[in-house]
Regions:
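Short beta-strand/loop motif that positions the catalytic acidic residue
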Residues: 278, 284-286
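N-terminal cap/lid subdomain of alpha/beta-hydrolase-fold enzymes
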Residues: 31-93
Length: 345
């Protein structure tokens, strides 16, 4: 599926990064749903997940849903590195391709904060929500701008990337970069590391969905006739898309791997202290069978958040239980979001 084109670009100008580099002429791609009201008090922020573009969030946006564009002004910022916002594939030298500087969740949120405050003069946000890497950005919003965020809902994500999760991410990086066609990230557009990307897809297939999903052969409900049909048609088909640039994927992997709200300036690596600083009600929604972000990760974090709560998505769809793939899981997420939005703050 090609990258969407129904977005706008916000000029960030020069964006200082936590690495010490400055991303000059940076741009943030975004899409909005609904209208901003007169006092700018109806804002929802919904960041994107790994490899996803803004359209991947649209399952949770619509009339009658919690994220209702008839009530709210919903901003969906594309994270840096995803190919629409400033990324290795879109940036000229000296930060082109493999030379693109590392981006943290803090950097992502500061870019989004510029968009909200400079483009629309927004001072408060009713809800920040996001899935997977979007959940990491949600936690970061609540820590970086507690005066601004009224509610937060991280879905199938975490406040700190666990070492077990890092093992998965390192395996993806290794398999992609070991393809001879990768050439240290200086690959030709006409000779992309497709062998590495096929292996990347096969590794992802074993982590993104649960053991029970495969035991029940749930892929048949998606229209695939066999395991091999699913691996080729769904997984390889997704990752071999021409618009999914390998350097962009590696840059997003770095952000994911180094996710930790404790790295927010002022907390000196103390994740627990960063979580204690969150002022708003925060309802985390891990999936029971998620191999990346198991419920235990969120239960650990929740004990430090003054108004923290965990609602587990009871699903066999693993990580995909929070990505809009299954109607029952979507309904659970939407009900939980509605309850959170109805809560006085």
């Amino acid at each position: 599926m090609p990258a969407p084109t129904d977005h706008q670009l916000f000029d960030l100008g020069d964006l200082p990064l936590q690495s010490g580099a400055t991303l000059r002429g940076a741009q943030l791609a975004y899409k909005t749903h609904g209208s901003l009201n007169a006092d700018r008090s109806n804002v929802i922020v919904h960041p994107t997940w790994f490899s996803a573009w803004h359209d991947a969030n649209e399952w949770s946006i619509g009339p009658g849903l919690a994220c209702d564009p008839e009530k709210y002004f919903i901003v969906v910022p594309n994270q840096l590195n995803n190919g629409l916002s400033s990324s290795p594939s879109t940036t000229p030298p000296p930060f082109d391709g493999p030379h693109f500087p590392p981006i943290t969740f803090h950097d992502q949120v500061e870019a989004q904060h510029r968009l909200l405050t400079q483009q629309w003069g927004i001072e408060s946000v009713e809800l920040v929500l996001g899935s997977s890497m979007g959940a990491g950005q949600t936690y970061q919003w609540a820590v970086s701008h507690p005066e601004m965020v009224k509610r937060a809902a991280p879905i199938v994500g975490s406040s700190r990337t666990s070492e077990h999760n890092q093992v998965f991410l390192k395996s993806l990086r290794a398999t992609l970069t070991l393809d001879p066609a990768f050439r240290g990230g200086e690959y030709s557009p006409d000779a992309r590391p497709t062998a590495g990307m096929r292996a990347f897809a096969r590794i992802y297939a074993g982590w993104g969905l649960s053991q029970a999903f495969y035991w029940e052969r749930e892929y048949r409900s998606m229209g695939y006739s066999s395991l091999e049909d699913f691996l080729v048609g769904f997984w390889e088909g997704f990752w071999l898309d021409d618009d999914r640039d390998p350097n962009n994927l590696l840059a997003m992997l770095w952000t994911w791997e180094h996710g930790d709200v404790g790295r927010t300036p002022g907390f000196d690596g103390d994740t627990e202290a960063a979580l204690r600083s969150i002022r708003c009600p925060l309802v985390a929604m891990p999936a029971r069978t998620d191999l990346y972000f198991p419920p235990e990760d969120e239960q650990w974090a929740s004990q430090f958040i003054p108004q923290g709560e965990v609602r587990v998505i009871d699903t066999i769809w693993g990580h995909f239980g929070g990505l809009g793939m299954n109607a029952a899981d979507n309904a659970f997420v939407d009900r939980t979001l509605q309850e959170l939005l109805d809560r006085p703050v």
